[in-house]
Amino acid sequence: MGNIIAPDYIIKIVQQINENVVFTAPSMSQRAAIFALQHRDEVQPPMIEEYRKRMFYAAERINEIPKISVIYPPKGSFYLFINIKETGLSSVDAADMILREAHVLTLPGNAFGECGEGYVRIACTVNVDTLKEAFDRIEKVMKEQ
């Protein structure tokens, strides 16, 4: 989701590109999905292990940072909901601060409903080295907050 200020002809082009990206999977992606489904016994275990490694690293690291925490051990997907209540910030303000000062994108928990207030969501879809850098930045921001 986003906004664009541009002449009408550019907006129409951007809209067409966006619709193709969002609503239709390119044939190359469809073929990759078919291959992955047909070979899931080979493809899935290393992917599961890699995401498990990322999630456990992220959860352990978050719980070492002042004023934030996460339920441990993580279960399920590659998203973590980080408890930011101790910061005294709203989830929107916390997500904004983390983006502005740490240059790490999170989503405010209240985007997922009222019960998400007091949390931000982070995706652990990048490698552990990138996660380490992100959490180093977040830790610095939290210590200064």
Task: Show which residues each predicted segment covers.
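Conserved glycine-rich beta-strand-loop-beta hairpin in the small C-terminal domain of fold type I
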Residues: 30, 34, 50-59, 71-83
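A general structural signal for well-ordered alpha-helical segments in protein cores
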Residues: 11, 29-30, 91, 95, ...
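PLP-dependent enzyme catalytic core of the Aspartate aminotransferase-like
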Residues: 90, 97-106, 112-145
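Conserved core segment of the aminotransferase class I/II
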Residues: 1-52, 61, 142
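Short hydrophobic/aromatic beta-strand micro-patches
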Residues: 3-5, 81-83, 123-125
